[in-house]
Structures are given as structure tokens and as C-alpha cells.
Amino acid sequence: MQNLCYQLKVIPAFNSNIYRLLELDGSCTFAALSDLILDAFEFNHDHLYMFSLGRKPYDPNGIYSPGGRAEKRADRVRLQDVAPVKRNKYLYLYDFGDEWIFYLSLIHI
């Protein structure tokens, strides 16, 4: 299977005037995507996180950071595993205490 390149636009909920464009291979795990987002916004890598494919914080069907009890672990699920579709929107929640929320949009495959 050929790995496709995905372009994501990441907008922090705390400041919608800024964004980052990330390009990554479809074989990239959600754990690696978390690292890319944190690096792009200069955050430390010291809290738990989750991704929601339906933009719902604490989504029971979400993809959670490794080490928890979630069925879908971010270090095991790849971007291409969730059958991303152009213009799909996702939520990334970092730090369950401070709840830093980022909105992700798939803008190009």
C-alpha cells in the first residue's frame, strides 16, 4: 500500500488568528502527530492527550495517548487507519487539566 502525504491545518482554540500547516505521511501515528503539533506550537511533551474524529473532547471513541486504558492508542493508530477524507475536521486535546484544544482540518491528500 502506497503511503499518501496528508496536509493538516492546525488552529488553536485559544487563538484562532494563528495556525500551522503540517505535512505528514499516512503511516504517521497519532502519537507522532501529537509530537508535531506540540513542537509546532512550542509546547512541552509532558501531559496526556487525545484526538477526537468527531470534535468531542473526551470522546469515548477517541484516540488516546499511550499508557491509558483506551482501546485506540495513539502509538498504534496511524493517520491512514482512520480513512481520512479531505476537509474532515478533528479535535486534539492536550493536557486534561488545562485542556488546550486544537482544531485540525485535513486540507490536502
Feature roles, as predicted:
Residues 29-43:
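Short amphipathic, charge-patterned alpha-helical segments
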Residues 97-103:
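Short coil-to-beta-strand transition motifs
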Residues 41-57:
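Short loop-to-beta-strand transition segments
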Residues 2-20:
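Eukaryote-biased recognition of intrinsically disordered, low-complexity regulatory segments
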Residues 4-6, 84-91:
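Short, hydrophobic/aromatic-rich segments at coil-to-beta transitions
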Residues 60-88:
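Eukaryotic mixed-charge, acidic/polar low-complexity intrinsically disordered regions
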Residues 16-31:
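Short, contiguous acidic and Ser/Thr-rich linear segments
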Residues 107-109:
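Conserved small/polar residues in nucleotide/adenosyl-binding loops
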